[in-house]
């Protein structure tokens, strides 16, 4: 979507307390920061802004996301390890879990979880949704954090009365 249209939509929905979900590749995040910061709505990063897991959680792109998340208007979906992984489901997406864990630990009130079902355009493998549920406790081991991730935060974002 062109930025001017994106901004117009954001301006229209702001009065309703709605939010914008952005799908962005991590390497494009830096150039979008001023634009995203200027939007009047909350902004939710889909798929953790697609970090390059090979660079680790200290990579420049993921650090940019973490810095943005310090501003309360930004939220993040801890979704799609199956799209980001290099090691795959056989290793419980262990290369993606540190990213999910870091977001959940640092921003427990502004992270969401989902399966990305029905997993459109998957090329490598079809994920097992049961396994995706099972790994929640690996990156959000505390019951209180799981409740925020799965219940409280979605309620706050989607039904922010």
Where do the language-model regions lie?
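Active-site glycine-centered loops adjacent to acidic/histidine catalytic or metal-binding residues
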Residues: 116
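Short, active-site-adjacent cap segments at secondary-structure transitions
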Residues: 83, 119-121
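Catalytic pocket-lining loop regions of alpha/beta-barrel enzymes
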Residues: 1-113
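Mid-to-C-terminal alpha-helical segments outside catalytic/metal-binding sites
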Residues: 102, 107-110, 124-161
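Generic anion/oxyanion-binding catalytic loop in active/binding sites
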Residues: 21, 121, 135
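Alpha-helix N-cap/helix-start motif
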Residues: 89, 122-125
């Amino acid at each position: 979507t062109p930025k001017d249209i994106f901004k117009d939509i954001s301006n229209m929905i702001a009065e309703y307390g709605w939010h914008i979900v952005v799908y962005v590749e991590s390497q494009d995040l830096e150039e979008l920061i001023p634009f995203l910061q200027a939007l009047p709505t909350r902004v939710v990063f889909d798929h953790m802004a697609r970090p390059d897991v090979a660079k680790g959680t200290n990579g420049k792109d993921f650090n940019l996301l973490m810095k943005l998340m310090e501003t309360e208007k930004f939220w993040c979906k801890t979704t799609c390890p199956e799209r980001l992984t290099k090691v795959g489901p056989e290793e419980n997406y262990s290369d993606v879990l540190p990213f999910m864990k870091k977001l959940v630990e640092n921003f427990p009130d502004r992270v969401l979880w989902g399966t990305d079902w029905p997993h459109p355009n998957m090329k490598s493998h079809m994920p097992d949704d049961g396994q995706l549920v099972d790994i929640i406790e690996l990156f959000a081991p505390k019951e209180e954090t799981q409740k925020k991730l799965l219940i409280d935060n979605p309620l706050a974002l989607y039904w922010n009365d």
